[in-house]
Amino acid sequence: MRNLQSNIGIQYTAIGDTERRGEVVSYHNSPSPAFLLKATTDDVNGLSESDKLNINSSGLFAKSKFAIGFEVEKTRLRRGAVMEYALFKGFEYDSSCGYEAITHVLPLVGRSMWRTKVFNMFAEAKHIIDEQYSPSNHKCGGHMTFSVDGMYGHQLMDLIRPFSGIMYALFRKRLANRYCCENIEMASNFGYEKYTVCKINDHSLEFRLPSRITSVKCMMDRYKLMYAILDFAINKPDARLSKFHRAIRPIILSMYEGNVEKADAILGLAVHFTQFLKTGKIDKYTCGWFEGWTSSRYGSFGSLRAKYSRTFRPIGCQQSSLNDFKARYEILL
């Protein structure tokens, strides 16, 4: 990502209002985020007509209707890299993995100069984000909080549910993680419980399911995917799943470094998770991921039997069910 030198439009720089933005502080005690949702009309030049639906414009200024924030969890931060960045609101100690860097509230926009400027902030923070500089491990997560202007969290949950099967497929190995395994149906009336797949807040949602962010490219791909999910949820809620999958396929291919076989396997699995989110019934395609059959010899076999579909009866033939599951998803294990 190039270093933008243009003086046209919005400029993202460190705020400089407190030294604490460049220090690691105790959990939940980093400074408040800035809401970086406004730009100029110069920044939205190049947006497609459909992407302009997600922007409010008034005179020379524009405001994103969609917003997103990331948590970047690490076991260690590169020496000398902890400082204030335009991207991060601050750094905190985290008891589960060590440290986390938390972004400001960012505009979630389509392909444009504005998006390029957001991605440039990611690149400027590479010594925090990239694994080669600041490592992480399996205990680290990649939580994402997102919102739509004027919408309550529970309303947004109902809208994104039909397009969230891809998140389950991508982060399938975390579906049995105790920190993000509740409310697997993404019910909008579940309340404000924390350890859910997608936590409901008053005016936002937090996907807790994603795994750790390991690179700037990883963060960019997730940004693009979340934009696509919200764009379909808000503007094309009745779109066929096949149309949505065609739209996100280039992003999934990028996530898997162009591996067509893996990308198509993920999209295929997403179809089954989407069906689960529609019916609430677990079947042979999804059970192993929900019950964690890949995390140990047996995982939590049978723990979700109350949600099994009528035609799915693995109880009593445990080993053969495990073998069939592992054979079916060998490429994704």
Kindly give the residue locations of the regions a language model identified.
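C-terminal accessory/tail domains of diverse enzymes
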Residues: 2-136, 149-333
